[in-house]
From Swiss-Prot:
The chain crosses the membrane at residues 19-39, 45-65, 70-90, 94-114, 138-158, 216-236, 243-263. InterPro entries: MetI-like, MetI-like_sf. It is a multi-pass membrane protein. One of its GO terms (cellular component) is ATP-binding cassette (ABC) transporter complex. It comes from the Bacteria. This is Glycine betaine transport system permease protein OpuAB. The keyword Transmembrane applies. Residues 90-269 form the ABC transmembrane type-1 domain. GO terms for biological process: amino acid transport; carnitine transmembrane transport; choline transport; glycine betaine transport. Belongs to the binding-protein-dependent transport system permease family. CysTW subfamily. Involved in a multicomponent binding-protein-dependent transport system for glycine betaine; probably responsible for the translocation of the substrate across the membrane. The keyword Cell division does not apply. Its main location: membrane.
Length: 282
């Protein structure tokens, strides 16, 4: 039985990636240097603060934004991380996650706003987001390595690709959920598109957008172990090293540290959303 001719898709993609690397190598080097400097700046800045003082700051922030229970959990959890010897890797992980989330917000929210205002843009963006969310995370690492070499930068890039879709989707959803009668009222009073967006739609969509940002934070944090495979430092690197060297105890310790950070960030960002809601109802 004759087989259909094979489509050389892999060869085409490899040639395309090689062409981009050769043509825009300087551009990608600039991005890599900028991202690396930003991440290192966060790590250095947090590293100047004594671990005990920074733990108290995190606990106070959790108390102010969230609840006493979360503040106590943050205090005990971060002290445990410090006494286990994973303080510096935790700071590196926080820097990677923070950088990824900032980029996701800065890029994702405007795209979400644009897609909510233009149906054509939404139809184009939606399948791209589907691809970003369904593509295996390991696949993101391949072009990231080609363009940015080994280190923290490809980890950040892969995390951004994986974590950005919820921010875009929830921004679109939040703006679309604004009641039509409010939109009609603003139009009746002669509001411009910008006035309607910034004074009505975005304030009412804030809760939904924050929910998307919360999801992006969790997805970025879930990428730390995968990012470690391309040289990104942090708690993920500790877990990856423990797996490759069959050190179960070390892997469990680093895993506990990741869980503590994840729960802390999740509860704090969730309670930002709740406080926004309660103030709006007051």
């Amino acid at each position: 039985m004759d087989r259909l001719p094979r489509i050389p898709l892999a060869d085409i993609i490899d040639r395309f990636v090689d062409w981009i690397t050769m043509t825009f190598g300087g551009f990608f080097d600039g991005i890599a240097n900028g991202l690396a400097a930003f991440v290192n700046g966060i790590v250095t800045g947090l590293g100047f603060i004594p671990s005990i003082l920074l733990t108290i700051i995190f606990a106070a922030l959790a108390w102010w934004i969230s609840t006493r229970g979360i503040a106590l959990f943050t205090l005990i959890g971060f002290l445990l991380i410090d006494y286990l010897g994973y303080w510096d890797p935790m700071l590196q992980t926080l820097a990677l996650v923070l950088t990824s989330v900032i980029i996701s917000i800065v890029v994702g929210v405007p795209i979400g706003i644009w897609a909510s205002q233009k149906e054509t843009v939404r139809r184009i963006v939606t399948p791209i987001l589907d691809l970003m969310q369904t593509m295996p995370a390991f696949v993101y690492l391949l072009p990231a390595i080609f363009f940015f070499n080994i280190g923290v930068v490809p980890g950040v890039v892969a995390s951004v690709i994986f974590a950005m879709p919820p921010t875009i989707r929830m921004t679109v959803l939040g703006i679309k959920q604004v009641p039509a009668d409010l939109i009609e009222a603003t139009e009746a009073f002669g509001s411009t598109t910008a006035q309607r967006l910034f004074k009505v739609q975005l304030p009412l969509a804030t809760k939904t957008i924050l929910a998307g940002i919360n999801q992006s934070i969790m997805l970025a944090l879930s990428m730390v172990v995968i990012a470690a495979m391309v040289g990104a430092p942090g708690l993920g690197s500790e877990v990856y090293s423990a797996v490759t060297q069959l050190k179960t105890g070390v892997g469990v310790e680093a895993g506990i540290a990741i869980v503590i950070v994840a729960i802390t960030l999740d509860r704090i960002t969730q309670n930002i959303k709740v406080k926004k809601k309660s103030r709006g109802n007051a």
